[in-house]
Amino acid sequence: MKKLFSLLLVLALALVPTLSLADDDAACQNLYNMLLDELKSVDLEMTADEESYRIYLGYALDKNSLGDADVIFDAYSDAVTINVSYSNPLDEALVPQVISFFNRVNSTLYVGKLMVIKSDNVWYAAYEIFLSVDPENITDWDRNNVLAYTALALDTMVAMVDYITEIANGESADNVFAMWQADIGAVQSPKRKKGRNRYGFPPFLIPIILLPR
């Protein structure tokens, strides 16, 4: 009897990682499906990879001297991320000053993080937003946040073009951050508008953290 109990215990313990992985996969699938549904609602061309729970799309920015936007959505077991980067790499000589500027701006942002990432030995400026979501209780608020924060991320990257250009023209991170502070002014109260914004996304109540220069 003791041997049988021991064997059953070993089998039960062996199944725990398998069950945990299955639960994680189901949670990721739920959040991936949410992302897919919301993005399909605005009729955007996208590439979806169900195996990695990732969705990719390209988007033309109003200001594209640094390239257009590469947007990547990733679904995890308890969160989704929205990552927007420029399609053109940064000049490596600018990287230290851009990182310094981004670090200063990040300390003031309401949501998300500006960063410089390295891929295939080239550097890209990016902005990432992390959204915590309960995969077993996805609310309308969670769904609305997908498009609302995608629009916010795109607006942020449009605004950053001018500041990165100033750095490319020889301004220091300190001076460019001072420009950003002067531009941002007082935080505006969010307003609900009818119709769709310039990205084609339905408008939502989102924090306005950047003002166009």
Say what each PLM segment does.
Residues 1-4:
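Positively charged n-region of N-terminal signal peptides that target proteins for export
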Residues 33, 37-91:
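Ser/Thr-rich, low-complexity intrinsically disordered terminal regions
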Residues 8-16:
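Bacterial N-terminal signal peptides
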Residues 192-208:
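Positively charged N-terminal leader segments that act as targeting/secretion signals
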Residues 133-150:
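A short acidic/glycine-rich loop-to-helix N-cap element
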Residues 163-193:
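Short, highly charged C-terminal tails/helix-capping segments
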Residues 18-24:
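Sec-dependent signal peptide cleavage junction
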Residues 83-128, 132, 167:
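Short, internal acidic amphipathic alpha-helical interface segments
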